[in-house]
From Swiss-Prot:
One of its GO terms (molecular function) is homoaconitate hydratase activity. This is Homoaconitase large subunit. Binds 1 [4Fe-4S] cluster per subunit. Catalyzes the reversible hydration of cis-homoaconitate ((Z)-but-1-ene-1,2,4-tricarboxylate) to homoisocitrate ((1R,2S)-1-hydroxybutane-1,2,4-tricarboxylate). Can catalyze neither the dehydration of (R)-homocitrate ((2R)-2-hydroxybutane-1,2,4-tricarboxylate) into cis-homoaconitate in vitro, nor the reverse reaction. Is not active toward (S)-homocitrate, cis-aconitate or citrate as substrate.
Length: 418
C-alpha cells in the first residue's frame, strides 16, 4: 500500500516508513511563535529550564497586535525584542507582516520540511509542500527546546481541483467551496492533500496559500498542496515528495474550478457557504481586505481593479492591510496603493490587522463586515452580534463601493442601468 504526502514527509523525518495512526517523534525544521503567544512560550521554557536548542530554527513574529494597541501589549513586545536578542532568536518586528506570509517570503518553509507554529493557520506552509501545523504554547516550547515534536500521523483527505477558474472567480471562492464540502469537522486531525489537475496546476503560490490556509477551517492537522506549476520553478522539490498512486485516503472530494461562481461564507460558521447571488444585498458597515488568507499583492491588485475609478460608499469603512512589507512595497511601486487610496481606502500596518478583533477595526454591536479573512465566528472581530461575511478581495471591493454585499459583475450591471 502506497503512502500519502503526509506519510511521506513524516516517514522522511523519522527515517522509516510510517502509517496513519502511528505516534512518532519528528525533527522540526522551523518553530514559529507569534506575539500574542510569546509570553506563554517564554514561561513554558522557563519552567523547563530550557532555551531553544537550535536558535536558527526559531522565529518570533510581531503581527497580531502590531503596532502595540496599549501599554500592556507594548511591554510584552519589548520583552519579545529583548528575549530574542538575548537568545539569538530571529524577531520579525512591527510592520514586517503576517507570520505565515513572512516565513514563506523569507524561505523559512521549504518542501518536505516540518514547520510548527503557535497559530492555527500554520497549515498555510503546505502551499509549498511543507507539513505545517499549529500547536499551543507548551508544545511549541518543547519543540523549540528539543528541536523535535511528537504527533500522531494523520489520515488524509484527498481534494482534487480540476480545470481553470472562470473570470471573476478566485482561489478564495475555491477554498470556501472546499470547506463547504468537507464541513467544519469533516477533516478533523487529518491532512487535507490537495491535487491540482487539468489546468489547476497554474494556480500561483499565493493562491495555493489561500487553499492551504483554509484547510484548518475543516479541522485539518495539515493542508498539503502537491507540488506542481510554479512551485517546481521556485523551490528544490525532492523526488520523493509526492503521494503514491495507491495511497489510501479517508475520503475524496473533487471540485471543478470552471463551474465555480463567487462564494461567501455567512455568519457564524466558515462552512456556511453560499453563492454571493443567494445572499447579496446585505448592507455593509466595514470591509476588510488583508490577512494571511488574502493580503498578498495579487489580492490587492484584484481589489484595485474593481475600485479603479470608483469611490467607497459614504457609510463604509474600507480597511486594507497588506500581508507584508514586501507586499506593501510592491503595491506602492505598481500604483495599486494609489488606486486604493483614491477610492477611499485606509491602509494599515502590514500584519494581521483587525482579523482577531483586538485593534485596527473592531466591530461595534450590530455592525456588518465583509472580510477576506478566514473566520467569521461570533465575536471574532468585536461585538458578539456583529456579522462577518467571508469573501474574495473582488467581492469585498465591490461591496465597499455598493455599500452592500455584491459582486463586481452585479455592480457594473447596476452602474450601466443607473
Amino acid at each position: 500500500m502506497g503512502q500519502t504526502l503526509a506519510e511521506k514527509i513524516l516517514s522522511h523525518k523519522v527515517g522509516r516508513p510510517v502509517r496513519a495512526g502511528e505516534l512518532v517523534v519528528v525533527e522540526v525544521d522551523q518553530v514559529m511563535v507569534v506575539d500574542s503567544i510569546a509570553g506563554s512560550f517564554f514561561k513554558r521554557l522557563e519552567y523547563l529550564e530550557a532555551t531553544p536548542r537550535y536558535p536558527e530554527r526559531v522565529s518570533i513574529v510581531i503581527d497580531h497586535v502590531a503596532p502595540a494597541a496599549n501599554l500592556e501589549v507594548a511591554k510584552a513586545q519589548k520583552e519579545i525584542r529583548e528575549w530574542g536578542k538575548r537568545h539569538g532568536i530571529r524577531v520579525f518586528d512591527v510592520g514586517r507582516g503576517v507570520c505565515h506570509q513572512v516565513l514563506i517570503e523569507e524561505g523559512l518553509a521549504q518542501p518536505g520540511w516540518v514547520v510548527v507554529g503557535s497559530d492555527s493557520h500554520s497549515t498555510t506552509y503546505g502551499a509549498v509542500g511543507a507539513f505545517g501545523t499549529g500547536m499551543g504554547a507548551t508544545d511549541i516550547a518543547l519543540a523549540a527546546a528539543s528541536g523535535r515534536t511528537w504527533l500522531r500521523v494523520p489520515e488524509s483527505v484527498k481534494v482534487v481541483f480540476r480545470g481553470r477558474l472562470p473570470k471573476g472567480v478566485t482561489a478564495k471562492d475555491a477554498a470556501l467551496e472546499m470547506v463547504r464540502l468537507l464541513t467544519a469537522e469533516g477533516a478533523t486531525y487529518m491532512a487535507v492533500e490537495i491535487h491540482l489537475l487539468d489546468g489547476a496546476e497554474a494556480l500561483t503560490r499565493g493562491e495555493r496559500m489561500t487553499l492551504a490556509n483554509l484547510t484548518v477551517e475543516a479541522g485539518a492537522k495539515a493542508g498539503l498542496v502537491v507540488p506542481s506549476g510554479e512551485i517546481l520553478e521556485m523551490y528544490r522539490v525532492p523526488d520523493w515528495l509526492y503521494p503514491d498512486p495507491d495511497a489510501r485516503y479517508a475520503k475524496e472530494v473533487e471540485i471543478d474550478l470552471s463551474a465555480l461562481t463567487p462564494r461567501v461564507s455567512v455568519p457564524f460558521y466558515v462552512d456556511n457557504v453560499h453563492e454571493v447571488a443567494q445572499v447579496k444585498g446585505k448592507r455593509v458597515d466595514q470591509v476588510f481586505i488583508g490577512t494571511c488568507t488574502n493580503g498578498r499583492i495579487e489580492d490587492l491588485r484584484a481589489a484595485a481593479e474593481v475600485l479603479r475609478g470608483r469611490k467607497v460608499a459614504p457609510w463604509v469603512r474600507l480597511l486594507v492591510v497588506p500581508a507584508s512589507s514586501q507586499v506593501l512595497e510592491e503595491a506602492a511601486r505598481d500604483g495599486t496603493l494609489l488606486t486604493l487610496l483614491e477610492a477611499g481606502a485606509t491602509i494599515g500596518t502590514p500584519g494581521c490587522g483587525p482579523c482577531m478583533g483586538r485593534h485596527m477595526g473592531v466591530l461595534a454591536p450590530g455592525e456588518v463586515c465583509v472580510s477576506t479573512s478566514n473566520r467569521n465566528f461570533r465575536g471574532r472581530m468585536g461585538a458578539p452580534d456583529a456579522e462577518i461575511y467571508l469573501a474574495s478581495p473582488r467581492v469585498a471591493a465591490a461591496s465597499a463601493v455598493a455599500g452592500y454585499l455584491t459582486t463586481p459583475e452585479e455592480l457594473e450591471e447596476e452602474e450601466v442601468h443607473a
